[in-house]
Amino acid sequence: MQQSTFEKIYEVVKQIPYGQVATYGQIAALAGNKRWARVVGYALHANPDPDNIPCYRVVNKEGRVSDAFAFGGGNKQIELLKEEGVEFINGYVDMKKYQWERPIY
């Protein structure tokens, strides 16, 4: 059975380690198409299982959280990331320290 685009995205997001973040573009590339960054946003907004698909670990390429975070807004996303030990500098995730280092094949 072939996976849908959203299923591919969810499988990648499930792999983001506790205490780390990934970018929309990074998730898109790992899911099979580097141009899917906006689609990643749509998929995360439609997340069917937020307890097992940690969409709050996905941030933009500068390390900013989404004001449109579907499950409580940007403040909730920041709260969840801080609970995992992710640090923010002037409202941005320190990407050098917390970005998931997953090779893109």
Name each model-derived stretch.
Residues 1-105:
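Nucleic acid-binding interface residues in structured DNA/RNA-binding domains
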